[in-house]
């Protein structure tokens, strides 16, 4: 394991947040330093070449993380539990005893542990939290109707959306990401949460070809607009009749391009959720 790091000015925070955190599929951490005008960006990577690519692009430095330093990226922060509706609590502490304690304290909640520093997509970023709320709301309707449902997570990142879908009752769950680091982390988080029957694999959405014989009741696509728009037609084609498409990871200045692309593909008017500079869309296909 290697870590690339760089100290940046506060004025650069938005750029680096968009670069590393917006798609919820990189293992990045941005920390405010004691000097309020400076921040530290860290990206944890399995391969040294991946870290060197970041040096070529941004400068900074690379260190190899020794085994004794694993606590640095696995230790829980003091972040409070993240509540998603009345159904889910997201903790950043993967300790088994901690999870048992939380489950005992909150017997009517589903507990998900996503170590905060292992990858982005822990539930507290606007893109991820909005997706989680929408997925929970839709799944409650399926539960009430006692209907089987399926879920596909495009740009799975930490795997938190796929894990949530499975815990909320989805009978078929798949997730993919173009980043091999994200796949490693998603599989690790699935193990931490003892969730079975989630298929996670490496795939670039540009090369992804949905099967005519398989569709999903819910597809979540947490990806940038410049990746989403060229692929929106085939993503929409993979949504089952009466199914849902949840799009997130879209910056405010790009949301009009998504609306225009969706209209050109004959998609209905979406419900739009805005949180800060991020926009999410919820489309439902007719029967």
Give the location of each predicted region.
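N-terminal auxiliary segments of SAM/dcSAM-dependent transferases
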Residues: 2-103
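A short helix-to-beta-strand connector/capping loop
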Residues: 58, 86, 107-109, 171, ...
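Conserved beta-strand segments of alpha/beta enzyme cores
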Residues: 61, 89, 150, 172, ...
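SAM-dependent Rossmann-like transferase core, predominantly class I methyltransferases
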Residues: 70-145
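Conserved SAM/SAH cofactor-binding pocket of Class I
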Residues: 118, 122-207
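S-adenosylmethionine
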Residues: 178-286
């Amino acid at each position: 394991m290697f870590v690339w790091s760089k100290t940046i000015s506060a004025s650069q925070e938005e750029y680096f947040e968009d670069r590393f955190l917006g798609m919820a599929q990189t293992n990045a951490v941005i920390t405010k330093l004691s000097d309020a005008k400076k921040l530290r960006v860290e990206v944890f990577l399995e391969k040294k070449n991946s870290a060197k690519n970041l040096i070529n692009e941004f400068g900074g430095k690379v260190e190899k993380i020794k085994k004794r330093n694993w606590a640095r990226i696995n230790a829980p922060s003091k972040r409070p539990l993240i509540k998603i509706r009345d159904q889910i609590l997201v903790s950043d502490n993967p300790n088994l005893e901690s999870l048992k304690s939380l489950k005992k304290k909150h017997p009517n909640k589903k507990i998900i542990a996503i170590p905060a520093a292992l990858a982005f997509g822990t539930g507290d970023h606007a893109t991820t939290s909005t997706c989680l709320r929408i997925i929970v709301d839709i799944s409650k309707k399926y539960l009430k109707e006692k209907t089987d449902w399926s879920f596909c997570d495009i740009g799975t990142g930490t795997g938190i959306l796929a894990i949530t879908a499975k815990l909320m009752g989805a009978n078929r769950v798949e997730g993919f990401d173009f980043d091999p680091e994200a796949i490693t982390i998603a599989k690790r988080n699935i193990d931490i949460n003892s969730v079975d029957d989630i298929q996670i694999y490496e795939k670039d959405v540009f090369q992804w070809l949905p099967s005519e014989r398989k569709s999903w009741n819910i597809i979540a696509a947490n990806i940038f607009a410049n990746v989403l728009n060229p692929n929106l037609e085939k993503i929409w084609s993979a949504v089952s009749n009466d199914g849902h498409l949840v799009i997130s990871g879209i910056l405010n200045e790009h949301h009009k391009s998504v609306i225009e692309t969706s209209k050109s593909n004959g998609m209905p008017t979406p419900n739009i959720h805005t949180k800060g500079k991020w926009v999410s869309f919820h489309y439902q296909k007719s029967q």
